Amino acid sequence: MERTEFEIPGGIPPRRNGGQGRAADTNVDANLKPDEYDAEVTLRPKSLTEFIGQPKVRDQLSLVLTGAKNRGVVPDHVLLSGPPGLGKTTMAMIIAQELGTSLRMTSGPALERAGDLAAMLSNLMEGDVLFIDEIHRIARPAEEMLYMAMEDFRIDVIVGKGPGATSIPLEIPPFTLVGATTRSGMLTGPLRDRFGFTAQMEFYDVPDLTKVVKRTAKILDVGIDNDAAVEIASRSRGTPRIANRLLRRVRDFAEVHADGHITMGAANAALIVFDVDEVGLDRLDRAVLDALIRGHGGGPVGVNTLAVAVGEEPGTVEEVCEPYLVRAGMIARTGRGRVATAAAWRHLGLEPPEGTIGDY
């Protein structure tokens, strides 16, 4: 099959080895970009039956919510953990929708003081769902106040300062807390133990991601061929947010260089233009592999050294690039540093040396 049926303006972009761009420019970062919020809201499913993927989590949540509604009580507090872009925020919205209640949203970094949390809790109505994103980053004073709120539906508000300060108990209407975290290991034991239901969101397989792409295309009123949807899904790192982002970029290409309908040729040509290769790696991912293999013989190399080589911050390499490269079997973490596997060597068109990890 022809890889493309379009002439790409300026030719195929070079596979740059340097790190001139920043991570914020990448199309395969699973974190939500500031300009994507409105688009995300319109694409989010509104019910558990409409939600694609995560069948185990959906079934378990359905039981929890249905049981609570049948008993006439608020459901247990819910903790959703997993990498960014898999639907944790969407699931919180669906929980409120399924319960027929209001959703109040905040984030861990926004709750710096106990007073910040007290203000949120005091405005809740009975049965409301309070969603705290990045709950692992909540400040300790606010976290300690949250313990009592979750268990007893009350908090103690301190009025005054010094010896004259007094504690006033404040009753809170029963509510359900939904916490989301990308780093469940950073949660304290007391906080984790107060969640009655915990769920781990998993990466998507290509068939489910293909359904996501087709659903999004329908909402955006964009025609798309099945093989084009599969191609976009296969390059989306198992993440719906990335699949939706790539679909929007492919749509842009198809509208400019074709009749707006997304064919396999349009999808391939667009993804070349936007520098996303056949396994979902972008410029920065390939720069990391290139620095590791061509620059350091395959490793082991520390993350700080890799970051300098590609011109990025160590946190960017560690949080944006490395998780997928490890999951894709291209990088192995060892006690001495990062090591390129045989798959990484071959992805760059090189023959791995004898004894390389994964060379069977």
UniProtKB/Swiss-Prot annotation:
UniProt keyword Translocase, yes or no = no
Residues reported in the UniProt entry to bind Mg(2+): T89
Q: From the UniProt entry, list the residue stretches annotated as the region Large ATPase domain (RuvB-L).
A: 24-204
Listed binding positions for ATP are: L43, R44, G85, K88, T89, T90, E151, D152, F153, R194, Y204, R241
Question: Which CDD domains does its entry note?
Answer: AAA
Give one GO term, molecular function aspect.
Answer: four-way junction DNA binding
A GO-annotated cellular component: Holliday junction resolvase complex
UniProt keyword list: ATP-binding, Cytoplasm, DNA damage, DNA recombination, DNA repair, DNA-binding, Hydrolase, Nucleotide-binding
Classify the main location. cytoplasm
Top class in the EC scheme = hydrolase
Positions of the UniProt region annotated as Small ATPAse domain (RuvB-S) = 205-275
Residues where DNA binds = R333, R338
Which stretches of sequence are listed as region Head domain (RuvB-H)? 278-360
What GO terms in the biological process aspect are recorded for it? DNA recombination; DNA repair; SOS response
- Transmembrane regions listed in the UniProt entry: none
Known catalysed reaction(s)? ATP + H2O = ADP + phosphate + H(+)
Q: State if Protein transport is listed as a keyword.
A: no
Outline the segment boundaries, as ranges, of region: Disordered.
Answer: 1-27
Q: How does the record describe its quaternary structure? A: Homohexamer. Forms an RuvA(8)-RuvB(12)-Holliday junction (HJ) complex. HJ DNA is sandwiched between 2 RuvA tetramers; dsDNA enters through RuvA and exits via RuvB. An RuvB hexamer assembles on each DNA strand where it exits the tetramer. Each RuvB hexamer is contacted by two RuvA subunits (via domain III) on 2 adjacent RuvB subunits; this complex drives branch migration. In the full resolvosome a probable DNA-RuvA(4)-RuvB(12)-RuvC(2) complex forms which resolves the HJ.
What does the similarity note say? Answer: Belongs to the RuvB family.
Show the HAMAP family listed in the entry: DNA_HJ_migration_RuvB
State the function annotated in the UniProt record.
Answer: The RuvA-RuvB-RuvC complex processes Holliday junction (HJ) DNA during genetic recombination and DNA repair, while the RuvA-RuvB complex plays an important role in the rescue of blocked DNA replication forks via replication fork reversal (RFR). RuvA specifically binds to HJ cruciform DNA, conferring on it an open structure. The RuvB hexamer acts as an ATP-dependent pump, pulling dsDNA into and through the RuvAB complex. RuvB forms 2 homohexamers on either side of HJ DNA bound by 1 or 2 RuvA tetramers; 4 subunits per hexamer contact DNA at a time.
Q: What is known of its domains?
A: Has 3 domains, the large (RuvB-L) and small ATPase (RuvB-S) domains and the C-terminal head (RuvB-H) domain. The head domain binds DNA, while the ATPase domains jointly bind ATP, ADP or are empty depending on the state of the subunit in the translocation cycle. During a single DNA translocation step the structure of each domain remains the same, but their relative positions change.
What name is this protein filed under?
A: Holliday junction branch migration complex subunit RuvB
